[in-house]
Amino acid sequence: MPEGPEIRRAADNLEAAIKGKPLTDVWFAFPQLKTYQSQLIGQHVTHVETRGKALLTHFSNDLTLYSHNQLYGVWRVVDTGEESQTTRVLRVKLQTADKTILLYSASDIEMLTPEQLTTHPFLQRVGPDVLDPNLTPEVVKERLLSPRFRNRQFAGLLLDQAFLAGLGNYLRVEILWQVGLTGNHKAKDLNAAQLDALAHALLDIPRFSYATRGQVDENKHHGALFRFKVFHRDGELCERCGGIIEKTTLSSRPFYWCPGCQH
């Protein structure tokens, strides 16, 4: 599943394609959304926001399209009039004079009013987004030490969107390698230096992954230039200590780590 950096890059692509342009055609697959088709003609997308792995497309009439891709959903940008070559099932079409954005295969799609946006169950449940530039290491440290999270093992905590939105398995793996910790640690057991390093890594690594999107290399995760240190590198040498990277399972997800320098 794409993680926060990949979702944010997708949002950037959607914004670049249609932001500020009048919508000339709107289509929704789900019957409960069809009533909004005529309401959106002539309106425009003001911005596309991410909350972890959810995407919020905001319109000029104050409506917001909520979508969560889950495992299978994908957004695509095409020239208006062009057919997208795919066997996926189309769920949403937002068309402007020159560009059209298409959402395929997703099932978690809703239209929200401003009031509903503030009370949506998923949006209320998720924690601060790691790509939010206003989120600081100090705030992350406070969350790590809060009664709600301080006794949680990192193996599960770093996958919990209620802790920090936008983290996922590859980020969990890379963050813990960066700070030299295994997944069985808890925030309450760390010393001040470890806690500080973890708080910074929880923001620095997702933001670096997002920022290095300039070129595409299909051999790297979701086309990002972000280079894995341990993820999917089991059996290879650790570049930090020369140990052999191993693969195991933590919180029902594959976990990659170096026994030589992660303790």
UniProtKB/Swiss-Prot annotation:
GO biological process, one term: base-excision repair
Any single Pfam family the record assigns to this protein: Fapy_DNA_glyco
Transmembrane segment boundaries: none
Sites where the protein binds DNA: 70, 125, 169
ZnF (FPG-type) residues: 229-263
Cofactor(s) this protein cannot do without: Zn(2+)
Cofactor detail note: Binds 1 zinc ion per subunit.
Molecular function, one GO term: zinc ion binding
Annotated active site: 2 (schiff-base intermediate with dna), 3 (proton donor), 53 (proton donor), 253 (proton donor)
Keywords noted in UniProt: DNA damage, DNA repair, DNA-binding, Glycosidase, Hydrolase, Lyase, Metal-binding, Multifunctional enzyme, Zinc, Zinc-finger
Superkingdom as given in the UniProt entry: Bacteria
InterPro entries according to UniProt: DNA_glyclase/AP_lyase_DNA-bd (IPR015886), DNA_glyclase_Znf_dom_DNA_BS (IPR015887), EcNei-like_N (IPR044091), Endonuclease-VIII (IPR023713), FPG_cat (IPR012319), MutM-like_N-ter (IPR035937), Ribosomal_uS13-like_H2TH (IPR010979), Znf_DNA_glyclase/AP_lyase (IPR000214)
Reactions catalysed: 2'-deoxyribonucleotide-(2'-deoxyribose 5'-phosphate)-2'-deoxyribonucleotide-DNA = a 3'-end 2'-deoxyribonucleotide-(2,3-dehydro-2,3-deoxyribose 5'-phosphate)-DNA + a 5'-end 5'-phospho-2'-deoxyribonucleoside-DNA + H(+)
CDD domains in alphabetical order: EcNei-like_N
E.C. no: 3.2.2.-, 4.2.99.18
Purpose of the protein: Involved in base excision repair of DNA damaged by oxidation or by mutagenic agents. Acts as a DNA glycosylase that recognizes and removes damaged bases. Has a preference for oxidized pyrimidines, such as thymine glycol, 5,6-dihydrouracil and 5,6-dihydrothymine. Has AP (apurinic/apyrimidinic) lyase activity and introduces nicks in the DNA strand. Cleaves the DNA backbone by beta-delta elimination to generate a single-strand break at the site of the removed base with both 3'- and 5'-phosphates.
Family classification: Belongs to the FPG family.
Name of the protein described by the UniProt record: Endonuclease 8
Natural source organism: Escherichia coli O157:H7
Species lineage: Bacteria, Pseudomonadati, Pseudomonadota, Gammaproteobacteria, Enterobacterales
Gene name as annotated: nei
